[in-house]
Amino acid sequence: MPKAFFMVRSVVIEALRQKFDRWYSQQHLPMALTEFKCEKCWRFWSAADAGVHYAVYQFADMARLDAALKSDGFKVLVADYDKTWPSGVTRTRDMLTLAEERSA
């Protein structure tokens, strides 16, 4: 079964970027790692658009990702995000299936 990834893309206004970065690193990412029970996760800031932040969570397969997104823990994460960022941050989510992986 191929790996599955959950990606959250957030667009953050400039005035909130430092606060958002600190919150995501210190609070939300550790909480998500615990609640999702994912294999690992990454965070990125876009080099092309400084206000775009990505968080990516890796799961063993799509069934595990689906289960994580149906969990009470996911509802807690969404509520925490919405409460902390009622304005100034917008987000979209996507579910990805690994199609191919190569090494040099």
Q: How would you label these PLM feature ranges?
A:
Residues 30-54:
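Short, glycine- and small/hydrophobic-rich beta-strand elements in well-ordered beta-sheets
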Residues 15-35:
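K/E-rich alpha-helical interaction surfaces of small helical-bundle regulatory domains
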Residues 35-39, 58-95:
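An amphipathic, aromatic/His-enriched active-site/gating alpha helix that lines ligand/cofactor pockets
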Residues 11-15, 60:
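Structural beta->alpha junctions
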Residues 3-11, 54:
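Active-site-flanking beta-strand signature of metal-NTP-handling nucleotidyl enzymes
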Residues 16, 51, 64:
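Short phosphate-engaging motifs
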